[in-house]
Amino acid sequence: MSSSRRSRTSSRLAAAPPPTDEQMAELISKLQAVLPTRGGEANAKQASSAEVLQEACRYIRRLHREADALSERLAELLLLQPSDLAINGADVPDLIRSLLM
């Protein structure tokens, strides 16, 4: 990153006032709303901000693991020969490539 871009970014960040407690509570509430709940646990009690952030981090890590596993599986499928796998006569690796483009 160039020094002029860095200074513009840092000056913009320095000029922004910190979020209010109300804004933070609203952001935490929005974050909690998009996290998967476990058996209504979120409805049973109001989670603290720290708990919501920890759950968000766990969820993001889980999504990364799932994305990695899917990426590995996709790579395996793309390495298959056309004769190895076909769906309704369509070559699966070619089908996957066309979907990715």
From Swiss-Prot:
One BP annotation, GO: regulation of DNA-templated transcription
The keyword rRNA-binding belongs to this UniProt entry's keyword annotation: no
Organism from which the protein derives: Oryza sativa subsp. indica (Rice)
Region (Disordered): 1-22
Primary gene name: ILI2
Gene3D superfamilies referenced in this protein's UniProt entry, alphabetically: Helix-loop-helix DNA-binding domain (4.10.280.10)
Residue stretches making up the bHLH domain: 8-63
Role of this protein: Atypical and probable non DNA-binding bHLH transcription factor that integrates multiple signaling pathways to regulate cell elongation and plant development.
GO MF assignments: protein dimerization activity
SUPFAM superfamilies listed in its UniProt record: HLH, helix-loop-helix DNA-binding domain (SSF47459)
Name by which UniProt lists this protein: Transcription factor ILI2
InterPro entries noted in UniProt: HLH_DNA-bd_sf, ILI2-like, PRE
Keywords: Growth regulation, Transcription, Transcription regulation
Family of the protein in this entry: Belongs to the bHLH protein family.
